[in-house]
């Protein structure tokens, strides 16, 4: 992500971090963390996700140490070396690095003003047998495109028909 250079923004970030640390259990922060997140982590995640996922429950939440670790785990579980994952034609560079390291092929779906092509995804499902669809639907990195609701629904319908898991990297969806 871009590094802030505005002194006022940096001061607010420093003050916020100091406020968090002032009330934190430092020993808990320095020890190994609970696998999948602490109950407090999961409660915070449920609070964050509930506006979009009203039935969200802490028992179905897995907290990870960052997107790279989570993507590496997901990609390694869904695809083996030489297998394929569909992505937007311009996709998150971190995913490219992970796929390269794991030997997974990324198949680029062409983009238009609404997002990745649904017809291209359907054709890929029929002919290439992808193991997953990775998408970054809100402020697609690096294009800043937001995928339309109708396109999201079309992609989801295709994924359901072909039993293709979707990895939705939607860090900005709540903004």
Where is each model-derived feature located?
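N-terminal "arm"/small-domain region of PLP-dependent enzymes with the aminotransferase-like
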Residues: 1-36, 40
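Conserved core of the PLP fold type I
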Residues: 27-163, 167, 173-175
